[in-house]
Design a protein with these regions (language model features):
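Enrichment for repetitive, rod-forming helical segments
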Residues: 14-17, 67, 89, 205, ...
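Generic detector of low-complexity/intrinsically disordered segments
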Residues: 15-17, 22, 35, 469, ...
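General helical secondary-structure elements
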Residues: 3-5, 26, 78, 421, ...
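Compositionally biased, intrinsically disordered low-complexity segments
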Residues: 6-8, 17-20, 219, 487-489, ...
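Sequence-pattern detector for short linear motifs
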Residues: 10-12, 85, 510
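Positively charged, small/polar-rich N-terminal and surface patches that mediate targeting and assembly
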Residues: 438-444, 457-611
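Glycine- and aromatic-enriched membrane alpha-helices
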Residues: 29-487
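Short, Lys/Arg-enriched N-terminal segments with co-localized hydrophobic residues
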Residues: 1-27
Length: 611
């Protein structure tokens, strides 16, 4: 058997199968076979290492889709631009600074790596694979932040702090963990980044969202500034959000598995990366179903990501039982995190980045010290629940505390400096109009579609709207001011009427059939959005009761002349009635004149469609 392997570090492997014998004609020794297998294994996993990096790069698309889908349409272009630029800007600063700090020679007692320009001065011996691999991980840390600070952050400010994260903040703490720094020397374990990437990104997201404040209309406050109500801002396209979730889950097999060194270890990592998010999603579905009355779609998408984040650090050291327990906790923790941000911390996080990445990054890191088992391939650790005592758990807690402290201190300083110089947040007008228009000159990310953004979509009951008096003379002054006393039709009767019907979309087909059976031969149909005073419990979005936001309705307009208008009204009422709020309304108008454009016929003659 002849084997030709390309130059060292190259990811090309060429085999020619034949018969290999030594000079004496004997079959090759076991030692030679073992050496060949090792060489082949090294090359195969070297190739997989780079394929995994490509998987992680593709996760940028997943983050972009999740963030765009979970926010409003007027900011979709801005979200896409941020997710593109944080990678591109991160690459620019990672070349001269970030890579050396992360994997350079230890300095300051393992606190930081020594920056190097080897990519320019010694390219032939440069560690190309590790550069690409660590670059895509670095970009993930920066992109996590954009979701929590979406819809109100200046694009320039985003570019600045993304550069700082990629150049300094992430490389230093990642050096502690993966670059041979002080945490690594102690035995801290974070295989793929629950702590180094997700907790850091989620913590930065929380700090940034808290410092710049909530989106306009997210919280209602009293005169003392106390939050009295939380408003739900549903994402404009849950389908795009779901696509992003699936892209991320797919990419996570590379995220977690790329650094595997043996086939069994890779298989075990894939298993854990499948079990934990699946369990987390099912647990979240059941919990939201019980808690809110219906399974929450967006929360379940977040739960899938939460399970993936939580399994990232321990994916190589846990068995199936550990992965299941980690997933169960992640599914509950993400719901708690979203509720906590909205109702306790009053931090506006549009996509749930804090709950998904920060809280579950912490949980996944701690889980190593609880569920690590030597039955996992290549694992040498034992967690608390597998007879390992508190040693590894203590190391994991130390890592969480120190990395979080580093992140809080550095990013608070960075955000404060940005806010005092170029400004962190856009103006009120820019936020209301949308960042697509104001920041990028993009009229709409969906060309040809009109975008409507209504912050407060409900009508409230007050002294002017509760008009229950039968006699106008007995009404209060406020009620009189809000009402119009009608004694006679404004327009003279012509015998021709316009009937406008607002109804539920679900009743349209029955309404059309009933009107057709009545003799109505033509109608104008428009899909509209409507709202009104809503009494009773409303729907929930991510655990927050929604104001009666504008709901889809159908508006049907018909012109009747020979058909008695009372008969039309009775037919419509009978067809639309269900006994529930929102059955619809009927408006009747006098029509002064009808003109058929083609023939010039008027009134009744113009209404005849049959020649």
């Amino acid at each position: 058997m002849y084997i030709f392997v390309s130059r060292p570090r190259k990811c090309t492997l060429f085999f020619v199968i034949g018969h290999l014998k030594d000079e004496g004609g004997d079959i090759m020794t076991k030692e030679v076979l073992s050496a060949i297998q090792d060489a082949v294994g090294t090359q195969v996993f070297g190739i997989w290492f780079l394929i995994g990096a490509a998987f992680v790069f593709f996760m940028q698309a997943g983050f972009a889709m999740v963030e765009a889908g979970f926010t409003r349409a007027k900011n979709a272009g801005n979200i896409i631009m941020k997710n593109l630029m944080d990678f591109c800007i991160g690459t620019c600063v990672f070349i001269p600074l970030g890579f050396g700090i992360l994997l350079g020679e230890d300095a300051l007692g393992g606190f930081i790596g020594t920056p190097t320009l080897g990519i320019f001065t010694d390219y032939a011996n440069f560690d190309w694979s590790n550069f690409v691999f660590n670059l895509v991980f670095c970009a993930t840390t920066a992109t996590i932040v954009s979701g929590a600070m979406a819809e109100r952050t200046k694009f320039l400010s985003y570019c600045i702090y993304s550069a700082v994260i990629s150049a300094v903040v992430y490389p230093i703490e990642a050096h502690w963990i993966w670059g041979g720094g002080w945490l690594a020397s102690l035995g801290f374990h974070d295989f793929a980044g629950s702590c180094a990437i997700h907790m850091v990104g989620g913590t930065t997201a929380f700090i940034g969202a808290a410092l710049e404040g909530a989106r306009i209309g997210k919280f209602t406050r009293d005169k003392d500034g106390k939050v009295t109500k939380v408003h739900a801002f549903p994402g404009h396209n849950i389908v795009i959000g779901a696509l992003g979730c699936f892209i991320l889950w797919f990419g996570w097999y590379g995220f977690n598995g790329a650094a595997a060194t043996t086939g069994p270890q890779l298989a075990s990592i894939f298993m854990a990366t499948t079990i934990a998010p699946a369990i987390a999603t099912v647990v979240c579905m059941i919990f939201t179903w019980l808690r809110y009355g219906k399974p929450d779609v967006s929360m379940c998408l977040n739960a899938s990501l939460a399970g993936l984040v939580a399994i990232t650090a321990p994916c190589d050291v846990v068995d199936a039982t550990g992965a299941i327990i980690i997933g169960v906790v992640a599914g509950l923790l993400v719901v708690f995190g979203v509720w906590f941000c909205d109702n306790v911390a009053h931090v506006d996080d549009p996509v749930g980045a804090v709950a998904v990445h920060c809280l579950n990054g912490i949980w996944g890191t701690i889980a190593v010290g609880l569920f690590a088992t030597k039955t996992a391939p290549e694992c040498t650790l034992k967690g608390l629940f597998y007879g390992g005592g508190f040693h590894q758990l203590g190391l994991q807690l130390l890592g969480v505390v120190t990395v979080m402290a580093w992140t809080i201190i550095t990013m608070t300083i960075v955000f404060k400096i940005i806010d005092k110089t170029v400004g962190l947040r856009v103006t009120e007008e820019e936020e209301i109009v949308g960042l697509d228009v104001k920041e990028h000159g993009l009229a709409s990310a969906y060309a040809g579609f009109s975008l409507m953004d209504i912050i407060e979509g409900s009508m409230s009951i007050n002294e002017n709207t509760e008009l229950g008096e039968n006699d106008y003379d007995e009404a209060s002054e406020a009620q009189r001011a809000a009402s119009v006393k009608v004694t006679a039709p404004v327009d003279p009767e012509t015998g021709i009427h316009k009937v406008v019907i607002i109804a539920k979309l679900s009743r349209y087909e029955k309404l059309k059939t009933a009107l057709n059976d009545l003799g109505v031969t033509g109608m104008t149909v428009t899909q509209v959005m409507g709202c009104g005073v809503q009494k009773g419990a409303g729907e929930k979005y991510r655990g927050v009761e929604m104001d009666v936001t504008v709901l889809p309705k159908v508006k049907v307009e018909v012109i009747v002349g020979s058909i008695p208008v009372d008969k039309v009204i009775e037919t419509v009422k009978r067809t639309l009635y269900t006994g529930h709020v929102g059955d619809g309304k009927i408006f009747v108008y006098n029509v002064q004149k009808v003109v058929k454009v083609r023939t010039g016929e008027e009134d009744y003659d113009a209404l005849k469609d049959v020649e």
